[in-house]
Amino acid sequence: MSVYKYYDLIRKPIITEKTTSISEQNKYTFYVNKFAKKLSLKRAIEAIFKVKVKKVNILNIKGKKKRFKGIIGTQINRKKAIVTLEKDHNIDYAGGIK
């Protein structure tokens, strides 16, 4: 699979206080395409970030019900991946920011 296809699998990294604290354990969190599988995510992260992936955990997040001007609607469903890297590898999210 080409590298451009891998970019379609990974939507964006999740950078919060909680995900920053688990990054010390070599775990990184991403929103991913809802059709992505564990093996394809592993290959995509290894190709894009040039790291060795140990394990991938996936969570399906159901959209919340919200009310806007009296009309009840729902937010979109999402898929989240928690990627565990090998011991000496890490991902620098802000590597290109100056």
Curated annotation (Swiss-Prot):
Transmembrane segments: none annotated. One of its GO terms (cellular component) is ribonucleoprotein complex. GO terms for biological process: translation. GO terms for molecular function: rRNA binding; structural constituent of ribosome. Keywords: Ribonucleoprotein, Ribosomal protein, RNA-binding, rRNA-binding. Gene3D superfamilies: 3.30.70.330. PANTHER family: 60S RIBOSOMAL PROTEIN L23A (PTHR11620). Belongs to the universal ribosomal protein uL23 family. One of the early assembly proteins it binds 23S rRNA. One of the proteins that surrounds the polypeptide exit tunnel on the outside of the ribosome. Forms the main docking site for trigger factor binding to the ribosome. Part of the 50S ribosomal subunit. Contacts protein L29, and trigger factor when it is bound to the ribosome. NCBIfam families: PRK05738.2-4. This is Large ribosomal subunit protein uL23.
